[in-house]
Amino acid sequence: MRVCFYTLGCKVNLNETGALEQMFRSNGFTVAQEGEPADVFIVNSCTVTNFGDQKSRKWLRRKKRENPGAVTVLTGCYPQAFPEEAAQFTEADLVCGNGDRKAILDNVQKLLDGHERIVAITPHQRGEKFEELPVERFETHTRAFIKVEDGCNRQCAYCVIPRARGPVRSRDEASILAELRQLTAAGYREVVLSAISLPSYGLDTGTNLVELVVMCAEVPGIERIRLGSLDPDMLTPEFITRLAAVDKLCPQFHLSLQSGCTATLRRMRRVYTAEQYAQVVDQIRAAYGERPVSFTTDCICGFPGETQADFEESCEFLKKIGFLKVHVFPYSRRSGTPAYDFPQQVHEREKQERSRVMNAQAEEIRREVLAAYVGTEDDVLLETPLSGTLFTGYTRLYIPVVVSASGHKSGEIVHVRLGEYDGERVRAAIC
């Protein structure tokens, strides 16, 4: 039997798909790639935007049309956040919530045996535990992703994720370290600690993210640790100082911004100002001293009430920080969130235009940041081979490079000298 997965959304979803792939492989299934025939098609959905829901439905409809005898499965955040809507999507033979995935294999087998359509969505409950979905290997990735936390206790005006993911639940440290040892034994040298609210790790168990990072760095074989998205207001000076002392931690910080305008941040119900965000960036740079450090972020354009002046202020803030990479999104009016009913909704054309302008500016900033690294040296994790000797990869700072590495293979770490940015990657040479 063959199963095909389609994953939307964040690194947590990527990790969870890896766990599901492993579950099916362990029970005799072969994992098919996109475009290949399969007996089961599973979409691990993202519901951050309405567009994400549409993509999930469109993919399953197409697979059902092309493979009328196959079993189709809708799982992930979409059915968990909007169970009634997802349950009505009849092209999915199994609709499965985030808390019901341990039974996904049994339910798929029932459907293969002729069982009628199944809807299994358990609502989140106070006091629920972290769902263990360990992964031993990521078939198409040279870095490993370890899910360490689930859920979010915040209530940002635009975000449906607390509804989809429930309250903060931290994974047991021993379980994380055991999985990390398995991954290093399988040859992985870089691990990404992923979570829905990474700085919240340990809030419910009496520990914290710094303690976890220190323990992960002590695992033999691991050479690089990378952090997922961080909320700036949760990074205390002590937290920052201790992180900067961990040599194996990649000095790249993805600090969630959403807007560089304090008035917009307040409407979003974010709990920091633009000035406080900048202070955290300064504290991180000070903690690293002369060592290089990079910053990446996300930014929303066209949030309700955002004026042209607010937007321009946000753009200026991006210049002030000097981000290596900015993920720019037009605001998506999401049902089930407070912002859905906010007045002063920005017209779709204006949201798209502001996104275009900000993307162009973010690329200019990126070029300026990368120009400063020409001639410097760093380590690169070799990832995708473009030819027999040419590889793409990322430095510790998360600079994308292309390098000729004869005699090396994907998953190895090599030392390089950085060259010019070609608009997609930095050209590098082994030194």
Regions found by a protein language model. Name each.
Residues 310-316:
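Short, acidic/polar
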Residues 7, 229, 257-259, 382-384, ...:
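Flexible glycine-/small-residue-rich
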Residues 255, 298, 318, 326, ...:
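Hydrophobic, well-ordered secondary-structure elements that form the walls
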Residues 72-73, 81, 86, 185-308, ...:
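Conserved SAM/AdoMet-binding glycine-rich loop
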Residues 1-201, 238, 253, 274-289, ...:
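Proteins enriched for Cys/Gly/acidic motifs involved in redox and nucleic-acid/cofactor modification
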Residues 139-141, 152-153, 249, 259, ...:
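Short flexible coil/turn linkers enriched for glycine and charged/polar residues
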Residues 341-431:
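Terminal RNA-binding accessory module
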